[in-house]
Amino acid sequence: MKFAWLLAPDTYWDEKKTFITAALESGIDHIVDTADSGRIKKLGNLTLISPDEDADIVLVGRDGEGDGTLELPETLEYSRDIEMASELSESGRQVAAYVEIRSKAHEELARRLGRVVDYLILVGEDWKIIPLENIIADLQEEDVKLIAAVADVDEARVALETLEHGTDGVLIEPADISQIKDIAALLENIESETYELKPATITRIEPIGSGDRVCVDTCSIMGIGEGMLVGSYSQGLFLVHSESLESEYVASRPFRVNAGPVQAYVMVPGGRTRYLSELETGDEVIIVDRDGRSRSAIVGRVKIEKRPLMLVEAEYEGMKVRTLLQNAETIRLVNDKGEPVSVSELGEGDRVLVYFDESARHFGMAIKETIIEK
């Protein structure tokens, strides 16, 4: 998963606090700083990267060989940064190394540090022309996260997307707060998956009695065309629409998906599924729109209540899938035109959007195995 850290600006406290607060509000909770550790820790539940011994991740290289404060020795066997990083790592501490790529010798310093630290921050005056990909390739087999220092969203995009391998994360050195928000939005877009939704034809729809159904209330507002992928079969999940439309019976609840009964699968991050009954406050689910674009959302509450259910069966190119939904006018699927349609108005021959996955599932993970669901 790609990530971003913030390098706190070297300025007076009130301005620094504004940048850190903006980062936290944008979901960036790893802060690199060398001067105000105590005050920063009071701003929220964050991870501090600092040379201080009480830091969550200890930083080496600032005021050392990594940033040019100390000259590199003739042989890296006598490198102060490598020695410090090795000692900290051996003592069980998480370590981040900071290296400005000033020369071939600094490239080699970065490679050596990448073999002993948890995180390696790479910095260059114009880092796009340094051999970043070579360093990435050399360290691919190592258990280290590579981070490129960037000033704006364009540099972040190159680091995370354009390079053949790309870095694991970026260290933001922003000139203004808008750059923090732009990079946070870029990360969300990079991490989002696209699901290929197919128009499946309804072959059967009928009431079947009562059962325990699950409403998933998220911490996000969903728009028209958005919902969750839910189904009785892991190999075929229906796009169940959010309660984002007004009804003559109830007010809209755009944070909610009335998803189905307790045994149904729901798509969650990482290409996994979970049972609806497993979800609880703080879990993550995937919100998908009618074009298959996705984003993650936090579960704020799950409500399980006994309600009348109906069976929906659909078929696409010989693949037949089913799901159960509450039998109510406010429960909607999404038709092949991308429009929400109430289950009370659906009939045989109508087409709705379904995500098909030929993989079998074991504890929610996709596996290559033959499985029959019916």
From Swiss-Prot:
The keyword NAD applies. It is an enzyme of class 1 (oxidoreductase). GO terms for molecular function: 3-dehydroquinate synthase activity; dehydroquinate synthase activity; NAD binding. Signal peptide: none annotated. GO terms for biological process: amino acid biosynthetic process; aromatic amino acid family biosynthetic process. It catalyses: 2-amino-2,3,7-trideoxy-D-lyxo-hept-6-ulosonate + NAD(+) + H2O = 3-dehydroquinate + NH4(+) + NADH + H(+). Its EC number is 1.4.1.24. Keywords: Amino-acid biosynthesis, Aromatic amino acid biosynthesis, NAD, Oxidoreductase. Catalyzes the oxidative deamination and cyclization of 2-amino-3,7-dideoxy-D-threo-hept-6-ulosonic acid (ADH) to yield 3-dehydroquinate (DHQ), which is fed into the canonical shikimic pathway of aromatic amino acid biosynthesis. NCBIfam families: PRK02290.1-4. PANTHER family: 3-DEHYDROQUINATE SYNTHASE, PTHR33563. Belongs to the archaeal-type DHQ synthase family. This is 3-dehydroquinate synthase. The gene is aroB'.
